[in-house]
Each structure stands twice: as structure tokens, then as C-alpha cells.
From Swiss-Prot:
One of its GO terms (cellular component) is cytosol. (2S)-2-hydroxy-3-oxobutyl phosphate binds at residues 88-89, 130. It comes from Hahella chejuensis (strain KCTC 2396). It is an enzyme of class 2 (transferase). 5-amino-6-(D-ribitylamino)uracil binds at residues 25, 59-61, 83-85, 116. This is 6,7-dimethyl-8-ribityllumazine synthase. The gene is ribH.
């Protein structure tokens, strides 16, 4: 008897429809995340006509917009991008926590994968590192996660 292993890959998601929900706040970082996500999707065969970018004011608003996009447009995956940078007040914890929790709920309630590409960092330097310099581009990583999940979910039940 052989154990069946089901994994996603980056090829099956090329024909899928993707929604990218982007928080505008901290745009100097977020625009690099968006470029990374778009580049990753293009490199894996996703046509620009299959990608729609939606812009929310900030990270706190991303979950509601992602939920409405999921319900109204039925993409195969949502890619959430934003940046929450810690300051001197508890604001960071509220925004970062609610954004993460909200996006998890959107995914579970809609049945549509939501890739989490929202940076939650302690400093501007960390944000810059994670948006295309030393630590890679977390926007590209979120796009790859979305591609993989689309392919994986296509195989569930086969």
C-alpha cells in the first residue's frame, strides 16, 4: 500500500484568476511588495488579464475589502499585501492582529485561498529588507503561495 501525497505546484494555477488587495499605507514598501507579486505571477504564466489589483487605505481595511472581493468577484485566490510598522504605541498590535485574523476568516468563510503578504515588522529597515532587498520579497512569496494553493485545491478530492 502506498501513501498518497497531494501537493500544489506553481503550474496548475497559471490559468486562474487572482485578486491582489493592497493597503496603501506605507506605500514606499507596499509598492515593492506589489511589484514582487506581479512579477512572480507573470513569471509563472499568469496573464495580466487574470490579475486585478484593489487598493485599500491601509492594513486594517484589507480584510473587509478581501472579503468583498472574494464574495463578489470569486477569484481563485486573493493575495493580501500591506505593511504595518511598529511605532511607540499599541496601535501596531491592534492593526497587525486584526488584519491577520480577518484575512484568516475570509479564507475559511469563502473557501478561497488568501495569501498573507502583509509585513508586520519592528522597523522601517526590516520592512525594506522584506520588500525586495536582503530578505527577499514577501509579496512575491505570497503570490507563489497563492499559485500553489490554487493548484493544491484543484487536486483535493481527485
Amino acid at each position: 500500500m502506498t501513501v498518497k501525497v497531494v501537493e500544489g505546484d506553481f503550474l496548475q494555477g497559471a490559468s486562474a484568476k487572482y485578486a491582489i488587495v493592497v493597503g496603501r499605507f506605507n506605500s514606499f514598501v507596499v509598492e515593492s511588495l506589489l511589484e514582487g507579486a506581479l512579477d512572480a505571477l507573470r513569471r509563472h504564466g499568469v496573464a495580466e488579464s487574470q490579475i486585478t489589483v484593489y487598493r485599500a487605505p491601509g492594513a486594517f481595511e484589507i480584510p473587509l475589502l478581501a472579503q468583498q472581493v472574494a464574495v463578489r468577484t470569486k477569484p481563485d485566490a486573493v493575495i493580501a499585501l500591506g505593511a504595518v510598522i511598529r511605532g511607540g504605541t499599541p496601535h501596531f498590535e491592534y492593526v497587525a492582529g486584526e488584519c491577520a485574523k480577518g484575512l484568516g476568516q475570509v479564507s475559511l468563510q469563502s473557501g478561497i485561498p488568501v495569501a498573507f503578504g502583509v509585513l508586520t515588522v519592528d522597523s522601517i529597515e526590516q520592512a525594506i529588507e522584506r520588500s525586495g532587498t536582503k530578505a527577499g520579497n514577501k509579496g512575491a512569496e505570497a503570490a507563489l503561495s497563492a499559485l500553489e494553493m490554487v493548484g493544491l485545491l484543484q487536486q483535493v478530492g481527485e
